[in-house]
Amino acid sequence: MKYKVMFFGTPEIAKIVLETLFNMHEVDLIAVVSQPDAHFDRKKNVIYSPVKQFCLDHNIKLFQPEKIKEIEEEIRILGPDIIITCAFGQFINQGIIDIPKYKIVNIHASLLPKLRGGAPIHYAILNGELKTGITLMHTIKKMDAGNILFQRSLEINDCTTTKSLTLELANLSALMIKEHFLELVKPNLVGIQQDENSVSFAYNIQKDQNIINFDQPAFFINRFVNAMYDKPIAIMQYNGVSIKVYQVKITNQKSCQKPGTIMIFKNQLFVSTQDFDIELLLIQLPNKKPLSPKVLLNGKNPFIN
């Protein structure tokens, strides 16, 4: 038996789940809903989101409403048995929540009730969590507060970045949807209520929240840089210039200079922090490519006044 499925999502993590649904024999993928086009290249050509590109490549019906409520009637006419969402980016109104026979199942990239919100992967790293994971949950009007259906965890280490963790969680999401799909379309699936006393939040990263504060311990700065990679990328300010920082390493050298002081030693760049110096391993000056300090310092040294 095939079930009529609609999918809501936009970025790469959602595309990997969409691809899995597209290839499942039990799924009749009737339509996809994604965010409106929002990114453009230097020539002002539209850059399609991963989900939109997949839909175009595979001739899948696609909606891109400014507000999901705009297409409530179209969704009602399509009559999905179940709607699956992943990193969609819009609140879903109650009218749409009530449409599918087997409800809306959201794929959330944290171990709920921890880290409700739009940036759970970033904050799992920022908060120093030792593990995170994927939660399949029923969608209700309150953000990420529905009953937990299934969860699976994975470990985080000091080298984990948002980019690497997103890929791991995307693959885990796809695996869980494949394994649990037939359970998701059972009418008696209720799940477990979330413990409201254990709730924490991971709101979207805002402009200027990616600026490094070197008046912090080195371990936190390392964590911060990892959390901001590869989007939006950590920024350090130097003489009024914003320098992107992709990768750092904590040293054993106690910081003797004022936090934020840049030091050059044998074609290496170090920055003092609250406790230990950190080494800058990969950085990017404005309008330049990301470079190692060794390559950068072989040219004109931007760190000498």
Curated annotation (Swiss-Prot):
GO terms for cellular component: cytosol
Cleaved signal peptide residues: none
UniProt: (6S)-5,6,7,8-tetrahydrofolate binding residues: S110, L111, L112, P113
InterPro entries noted in UniProt: Fmt, Formyl_trans_C, Formyl_transf_N, Formyl_transf_N_sf, Formyl_transferase-like_C_sf, Met-tRNA-FMT_C, Met-tRNA-FMT_N
Keywords recorded for this protein, A-Z: Protein biosynthesis, Transferase
Cross-referenced HAMAP family: Formyl_trans (MF_00182)
Protein name: Methionyl-tRNA formyltransferase
Organism: Ureaplasma parvum serovar 3 (strain ATCC 700970)
Gene behind the chain: fmt
